[in-house]
């Protein structure tokens, strides 16, 4: 099975270890990974900021780059969601809408692909300790991926998963929201950190680097001892 990886901007620039873990997990599960170097941003930051035409240019480039893939997998629920929004963005342009739909139909978030396409629930990972899961807004509410991360983590040897209080609440990142609405964002992430600490977890695990960078940065500034990990890193662990 051939998988074309969309690594995302944040992974490429800040969390390359997440990209490596994603590839290693998928290869162990029998996937052949392709990485088109022509890939760029999915267009979400520009689109959400109102720069629609600039976003469309990036989206067209991404459609051209990925439309011949068998499966498109990304370690980000947010970016996967944006791919699924492409047909809506091009709804008034039949030619591009058709090409966008072709791409959207074969785009999956990392854990979604493992559980729903590969039909795997245990990747053979092990990580001793207590964890709690942050469920990102785009991944759960827009993409509809709610159970896959928990299913996979429940099979990680030695890992105890505790429910995060107020798990449905946003962490305050929201892309440019954290910059444009900083006081509100800070209050939201403080509440999220309080919820994490309430669980007594050793690890905070999530599937979106934006959320994890935001929460992890706050945890570090507050001097809390919780390790923040992307779920790909956890599933690649052999502790």
From Swiss-Prot:
It holds the Pfam family CCG. It comes from the Bacteria. GO terms for cellular component: cytosol. GO terms for biological process: lactate metabolic process. Coiled coil: none annotated. GO terms for molecular function: oxidoreductase activity. InterPro entries: Cys_rich_dom (IPR004017), LutA (IPR022822). PANTHER family: LACTATE UTILIZATION PROTEIN A, UNCHARACTERIZED PROTEIN YKGE. Belongs to the LutA/YkgE family. HAMAP family: LutA (MF_02105). Is involved in L-lactate degradation and allows cells to grow with lactate as the sole carbon source. This is Lactate utilization protein A 2. It comes from Bacillus mycoides (strain KBAB4). The lineage of its organism: Bacteria, Bacillati, Bacillota, Bacilli, Bacillales. The gene is lutA2.
